[in-house]
Amino acid sequence: MTDFVAIYRSPSYSPMQHRSNDTAILDGTVAHLTSKGWRVTAVSEADIEQGRLPAVPLYLNMCQGPLASERLMPLELDGAVVLNRPSSVLNCHRHRLVRQLAGNRVAFPHTVVVPSSATPATDVHLASLGDDGRRLWVKRGDVHAERPEDVVATTRSGLAAAMAAFTARDIPWVAVQEHVEGPVVKFYGVADGRFFRYYRADGGPSGAATAPELDGDRLRALAFEAATLLGLEVFGGDVAFPEPDRPVLIDINDWPSFAPFRDAAADAIAGYVVDRMRARS
C-alpha cells in the first residue's frame, strides 16, 4: 500500500473552460490508484504555497504557479517521486519554454520574449520578426494562457496595440510568435509511450480523430522529443503541419485535462505511476 498526495491546480492557472476538466483528470487518476488500495491525501495548490505538505513517497503534481513549484523542489532531493517534476512545470512557463525549445533545435516557430511595454518599431528583438503582413501571435510571457485574451492574433501593424493590452493588464512580458500555416493538431501523452492520442483541432476529437493525412509518427516523435527535453512525464500540446510530413510544435504543457480521452488517460497515468513506484522499490 502506498500513501500519496494529490495536488490540485489552482483555478487561476486553468483556462476558464478547462477548470472542471483539470480537476476531473486528477480525480480519475486518484480513483484508479485508490481502487488498488493506495491511500490519498488531497491538497490544493494554495496549501502547498502555505507550506502545508504531508510527507509521503509520492506526489501527483498539477501545480503551475512558481511559488508552489519552488516549495515542491526539495522533495525529490529527499527521495520522493513528484509527477510532474516542479522543474518541468517551470520549464513550461512561456519565457523558459521559448528558451529551452529554441536552444535545442526542436521544430518550433520563431518566437521572441520581450517586455509588454517594448516599442515594436525600435525593439531589436521584435525586428527579427517578419514584416510582410503575416499573422503574429502575442501570448502572455510568464505562465500559461488563463483566459482567451492571453493569446491574441495580430499583424505587425497591430502589434503595438496588442502588446499595450497586456501592459494594461499588468502582464510584464509577452511572447510574440510567428504564425505557422496548416492544420493544428492537439496531442496528449504519457512519458513511456503507453498513452498517446491526437486529433485535428478543426475536426474535434469525434471528427478526424487520428488525422490520417498527417504524419502521425513524426508528430509523436516531436511531442516526445519536446516532453523529454522539458522533463515532462504527463503532457499535452499543439502542433501545426505546414506540410503533411512536417510538424511544428506550437505549445506544450504539463498535465493537461485530457478531456476528450479522460478515462483512458487516467487509467494510463495511474498505471505509469504504479510502475514508477515499483521500479524504485
Stretch-by-stretch model annotation:
Residues T2-S10, G79, S87-V174, E181-G182:
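Active-site nucleotide/adenylate-binding loops and adjacent lid/helix of ATP-dependent enzymes
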Residues A6-T119:
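Conserved N-proximal alpha/beta basic substrate-recognition cap immediately N-terminal to
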Residues A42-E45, V185, L232-P244:
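A short glycine-rich, hydrophobically flanked beta-strand micro-motif that places a catalytic Asp/Glu
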Residues Q64-P66, G141-V143, W255:
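Short glycine-rich anion-binding loops that position phosphate/pyrophosphate groups of nucleotides
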Residues T29, T228, P242-S281:
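C-terminal active-site "lid" helix and adjoining low-complexity regulatory extension at the edge
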